[in-house]
Amino acid sequence: MGMKSPNIAAFMLPLLLILFTLSSQLKVVESTGRKLAWGFSGTPIVYTPPSRSCGTSPAVFTSKWRRPRPCRLPPGSYIPASDQSP
């Protein structure tokens, strides 16, 4: 029974060291374009476009951050200006 404690300690110490090393390397970044980076080198993994972009998916897996594209509406769709009544 007394031999179990050293075995558990010998297993947990390297495991905790690896866990601490990995957790110190990870970064979570949120900027104006809602760029989420969660990686070892700081490269963005998930990019969420701003809310004013229309028709795009909420999250795009990418290895490089790109500028958001201008809003493009499908042909035939019309959005009235706010100062005009429909």
Swiss-Prot record:
Origin organism is Arabidopsis thaliana
Taxonomic placement: Eukaryota, Viridiplantae, Streptophyta, Embryophyta, Tracheophyta
GO BP field = response to bacterium; response to cold; response to ethylene; response to jasmonic acid; response to salicylic acid; response to salt stress; response to water deprivation
Q: Name one GO cellular component term.
A: apoplast
Instruction: Show where the record puts the motif SCOOP motif.
Output: 45-58
Subcellular location, record wording? Cell membrane; Secreted, Extracellular space, Apoplast
Q: What is its main location?
A: membrane
Q: Which GO terms describe its molecular function?
A: LRR domain binding; receptor serine/threonine kinase binding
User: Mind telling me what this protein is named?
Assistant: Secreted transmembrane peptide 6
Protein's job: Brassicaceae-specific phytocytokine (plant endogenous peptide released into the apoplast) perceived by MIK2 in a BAK1/SERK3 and SERK4 coreceptors-dependent manner, that modulates various physiological and antimicrobial processes including growth prevention and reactive oxygen species (ROS) response regulation. Prevents general growth and development.
Provide the induction entry: Induced by cold, drought and salt stress, but repressed by pathogenic bacteria Pseudomonas syringae pv. tomato (Pst) DC3000, jasmonate (MeJA), ethylene (ET) and salicylic acid (SA), mainly in shoots.
Signal peptide from the UniProt entry? 1-31
